Amino acid sequence: MKILKIFLLSLLFWLQYSLWFGKNGVLDFIKIYRRVTIEKKNNEYLDMRNNQIILEIENFNNHINKDKKKT
């Protein structure tokens, strides 16, 4: 019975170590989650900038069309 307890405790510690520090463990998940959050914020900024550029292009095209109509 004592050997079984030692084996089960060893297994538990090994599984916990793998969960927290192993490949694709909790620490890797936290790192990736932070990167994704940063990239989402960056994408929001780029979307806003793209929308501003689209508005500038539309305004430019409207001014060109007005000038063509005047002539």
Swiss-Prot record:
Keyword set, alphabetical order: Cell cycle, Cell division, Cell membrane, Membrane, Transmembrane, Transmembrane helix
Transmembrane segments: 4-21
Keyword Transmembrane helix found: yes
GO biological process: FtsZ-dependent cytokinesis
Cytoplasmic compartment residues: 1-3
Extracellular side: 22-71
Top-level lineage group: Bacteria
Annotated Gene Ontology cellular component terms: cell division site; cell septum; plasma membrane
Annotated membrane topology: Single-pass type II membrane protein
Places the protein is found: Cell membrane
Record-stated family: Belongs to the FtsB family.
Function: Essential cell division protein. May link together the upstream cell division proteins, which are predominantly cytoplasmic, with the downstream cell division proteins, which are predominantly extracellular.
Name by which UniProt lists this protein: Cell division protein FtsB
